Regions:
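Intrinsically disordered, low-complexity proline-rich tandem-repeat tracts
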Residues: 593-594
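Cationic, low-complexity basic patches in intrinsically disordered or flexible, solvent-exposed regions
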Residues: 586, 590
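Domain-level detector for long C-terminal conserved domains
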Residues: 1-401, 412, 418-584, 597-612
Length: 612
């Protein structure tokens, strides 16, 4: 199998789990006398998982420990603008408080990893893409909730126009046969082995994925490899194509070999979208919900883990509430048992009806076999018995009706007496009473009558007001954690490395797996002496063997050492962290001081010349 083709030319989801870019006790981000913003670059991570998790952790530490942090500037860079458009769509969905948290999470999972979508998500996309177009075009009428946290200044006019075209292509009126495009990709990768693809999918799982991610179940992985559907919610029918996964890449024509742009599905067909949110958990208690025997046996699958993580993040960031997983599971069990009971009762009713029908049919057959005289005698006897029973039943019904009418009359009389007493108490006015006193007494009577009738309604409204929240505001974490998102598209060398604005600018840089090739000597210009470098690894990618994974790690460490970086002890299995050597730090500081001195001398000379 061609590895590069199977990974995809345009990646729509991450290949590593989420991480916190700042530790909770990190001195870099703590608020001090220096309140300059911390600048973070996230390049080609393919989604917002690192951003969401860092904001979640900072918000939790602010609430629990009371720590204050410096403002943060997140520069989210993607080579392909289609991925940036998806990021904007996910931000809109996360901040959409008209939807419940569970609805938001389910729609996010479906748009994130499914090639086919249900009708409700398609309707939502058809509404939101118009709002996103108006936001990108800076229409004054469109004032979304997230307008103050997203900055488009790093995008060119040409990129904004192309993003507008991408959003307009989300409309369901434009055809996009994603099943055909994806099947062509699979057929091209497997070639002669396409007819035996299920066996190959099984091989990839057992030889690669099962070793590092056993919670990804075999049947779900094979179902995704074959159909492109990773997350199945309830009883939805997945029929409509996910147009957010459409993109263009450069290709060549068969005749003449002229270059052209080819539209299709150019994403991942091997690794699966379970890796980003469906593997890692924070605490041992959470691990006990999904695993047993120290992560050897699993109780649930990766879809449950992704749903748990997303609901936990959004519930805490929006409502500042902890997610009680076991309580929700008990409610699910209760609802499931009720549904089972209902189904059993319905089956019993159907069986009884069928038995009654059979008995009637048998009786009719027997009647036909009996002689006519006997049938007439039996019919007369049945009529007599029926007439007696009907008479007795009618008499009982009459007695019951009379009793009910008597009770209703008594109740009405009692109500009328009480109302008359209230009117007499409230409305009777003395000769010496003023008009103001009259109005006061009348108002008391009216208020008492209204309050007695609407006590339940007022309680319901009060409960609703406690549950509802302002839909025109950001979620709580986005309001309290000070940050801003800058979207950057296109080549990183042209849009970041070569710009003077970003010289010695970034404090933290995270490179996705596909951005490793963009790391070169030009990258040193944007670094500070204390910059931390983070690199995503291919530890959880099924398209690589164990040897190639080790070689990739070794080559990455060598490359960073040659450029003056040292591997940090806080590195993870799926992510390496590097720091600049102390010698290089001193050299960089000297260079910065010399540059500052030169700039000051130039400024002083300019001022002297202007004064002269």
């Amino acid at each position: 199998m061609d590895v590069l083709n199977s990974i995809g030319f345009v990646n729509f989801w991450g290949v590593t789990p989420f991480i916190n870019l700042f530790e909770t006790e990190d001195e870099l981000i703590k608020k001090t006398t220096i309140n300059e913003p911390v600048n973070v670059l996230i390049s080609n991570s393919n989604d917002l998982r690192h951003f969401i998790y860092t904001i979640y952790k900072l918000f939790v530490s602010q609430k629990e420990k009371g720590t204050e942090y410096r403002p943060i500037n997140f520069y989210i860079h993607e080579d392909h603008l289609e991925v940036l458009c998806r990021d904007l769509l996910f931000l809109h969905l996360i901040t959409d408080r008209n939807k419940s948290i569970i609805e938001r999470c389910e729609m996010l999972m479906e748009i994130y990893g499914n090639c086919l979508l249900p009708s409700r998500t398609i309707d939502y996309i058809n509404i939101t893409y118009k709002l996103l177009i108006s936001f990108i075009c800076q229409d004054k009428k469109s004032q979304p909730v997230y307008k103050n946290i997203i900055d488009l200044s790093c995008l060119t006019h040409k990129q904004i126009d192309s993003m507008q075209e991408i959003f307009s292509s989300y409309d369901s009126k434009y055809p996009y046969d994603i099943e055909k495009y994806r099947n062509d990709r699979v057929r091209y990768c497997l070639k002669d082995r396409y007819d035996y693809r299920k066996n190959l999918f099984d091989w990839d799982y057992n030889m690669n994925i099962q070793n590092f991610a056993p919670i990804i179940r075999l049947r779900y992985y094979i179902f995704w490899r074959e159909n492109g559907i990773a997350f199945v919610m309830r009883v939805n029918q997945y029929k409509f194509p996910n147009r957010t996964l459409a993109c263009y890449i450069e290709g060549k024509k068969k005749q003449g070999h002229d270059s052209c742009m080819v539209r299709g599905y150019w994403g991942d067909i091997v690794n699966s979208p379970y890796l980003s949110y469906g593997l890692e958990l924070e605490t041992r208690e959470e691990i006990s919900y999904f695993y047993a025997n120290n992560k050897i046996d699993y109780l649930r699958d990766s879809q449950d883990v992704t749903e748990y993580n997303l609901v936990k993040f959004l519930l805490r960031m929006d409502h500042d509430e902890k997610y009680d997983f076991m309580k929700r599971e008990k409610e699910k069990e209760r609802l499931r048992q009720e549904r089972i009971k209902r189904e059993e009762e319905e089956q019993e009713k159907k069986e009884k009806e069928e038995q009654e029908k059979k008995e009637k049919e048998e009786k009719e057959k027997k009647k036909k076999l009996k002689p006519i005289a006997e049938q007439e005698d039996e019919e007369e006897e049945e009529i007599c018995t029926d007439s007696q029973e009907t008479k007795e039943r009618k008499e009982k019904e009459k007695k019951e009706k009379e009793e009910k009418e008597k009770e209703e009359k008594k109740k009405k009389e009692e109500k009328e007496k009480k109302e008359n007493e209230k009117k007499d108490e409230g409305i009777i006015i003395g000769k010496n009473d003023n008009i103001k006193e009259m109005t006061k007494k009348l108002a008391k009577v009216v208020n008492e009558s209204k309050s007695s009738d609407t006590t339940e309604e007022s309680l319901i409204k009060a409960m609703d007001n406690e549950k509802t929240y302002d839909t025109n505001e950001l979620i709580q974490a986005f309001r309290e954690v000070k940050f801003k998102i800058f979207l950057v598209g296109g080549e990183i060398e042209k849009n970041i490395y070569k710009k003077k604005k970003f010289k010695n600018y970034f404090d933290v840089i995270l490179y996705g797996f596909h951005a490793r090739s963009k790391f070169n000597e030009m990258q040193k210009s944007i670094l500070k002496p204390t910059t931390r470098l983070l690199f995503e690894l291919n530890s959880y990618m099924a398209s690589f063997e164990e040897k190639t994974r080790k070689e990739y790690r070794e080559n990455l460490v060598k490359m960073c050492k040659n450029n003056g970086f040292v591997l940090d002890d806080t590195s993870l299995k799926y992510l390496y962290q590097f720091k600049i050597k102390q010698e290089n730090q001193q050299e960089n500081q000297q260079e910065n001081e010399e540059e500052n001195e030169i700039n000051t001398t130039i400024e002083s000379n300019v001022t002297e010349s202007t004064n002269a």
